[in-house]
UniProtKB/Swiss-Prot annotation:
This is 4-hydroxy-3-methylbut-2-en-1-yl diphosphate synthase (flavodoxin). Its cofactor is [4Fe-4S] cluster. The keyword Oxidoreductase applies. The gene is ispG. Binds 1 [4Fe-4S] cluster.
Amino acid sequence: MIKRRKTREIDVGGVKIGGDNPVVVQSMTDTKTHNIEETLSQIKRLADAGCEIIRVAVPTEKDAEALKEIVKRSPIPVIADIHFSPRIAFTALESGIHGIRLNPGNINDEGKIREILQECKKKNITVRLGVNSGSLEMGILEKYGFPSGEALAESALNWSEFFEKVGFTKFKVSIKGSDVLQNIEANKIFAEKTDIPLHIGITEAGPAGRGSVKSAVGLGILLYMGIGDTVRVSLTADPEEEVKVAYQILQSLGLRRRGIEIVSCPTCGRIEVNLPEVVRKVEEKLDGKNIPIKVAIMGCVVNAIGEAREADIGLACGNKSAILFKKGEPVKRVSEDQMIDQLLKEIDNLEI
C-alpha cells in the first residue's frame, strides 16, 4: 500500500487536488486555442478518455480572447498556459478560466507576477507555478552550473515563498525536466520541505513508445514515494494517448482504476495460437469500456490459471481451444474460433 504525501487541498473548477483526494489526470490540447470548435472537440474527446483537467496554450491575445467561449462550453476545468506575457495573462484572467499556469522564470518581473496573483486571488483562480529546466533564473544557474535537481527545487521553493509572502496560497507546483533522475530528485527535495500540492510529469518525454516508458519510470518512482497530486504524461502523440498511459501508470500502482486492465503472457514455444493477434482483437473490442475488471489472456494451460488467479476473467489458450476461467476457476472449454466471442459475452454478463 502506497502512503501518499499529505498536502494541502486546493480545487480547480470543482476538481479537488491534494489532501486525501485521488491523483488527478491532466492533459493539454495541441490545437490552436483560437480555433474554438476544434479545441472544444478535442477537449470533449479527452474528457471522454478520462482527462479531468485540461490545459490550453495561450501564446496570443487572440487565444486569450477565445477562452471565454471555451470555458463556458468545456466539460472539464480549463487552465490557461501563459509564458512571457503578463498582458496576455490579464486578458486570460477575464475569461472565467479555472486556473492559470505561470512560469516565473520567463516572465521575470516580480511586480507583474504579484499583480497577477492579486487578480487570481480576487477571482478565486488557482495557479500552477511551473518551474522548468529550460527557463531557470540566471542566479540559480550560476550557482549550480546547470539545471540540477537541487537547482530546480531551490527555484520552486523560492517562488513558493514569494507566492505565500504576497498572501497567495491557492496554488500547486510543477518541477519538470526531460531527465528522469533530475526530475525525481527535484520533486523529492521539494516534497520534503512543503505541503504544497505537486503536479508531476516528465517534460519532452518523447514519442509514444519511448515517452511512455520514460514517463512510467519517472512518474512510477515518484508516485510510489507518495509524491504527486496531479499528473500529465507528456508525449509527442495524440493527447488521448497521454491520458490512456497516465491511467495505466496509476492503475499499475493501485492508485486509480479506469477501464479494463488486460494482462497477457509474453509467449514462448509452448503456445499454439497467435496470441498477440488474440490480445489485439480483445483489446480492440474492449476499448472504451469503463468497467473496473482485469482480463487475462494466456498462451497455454501450464501456469495460466494459477498465474492469472487475480484476474476477474480470462482465457487459457491451447491447441484449437481455450479454457475460459473466472477468478482462477475453470468455467468451460471453448473452441478457438469462438473463444474471443465467448470471452466478450461473459464480460458483458459479469456483475461488477
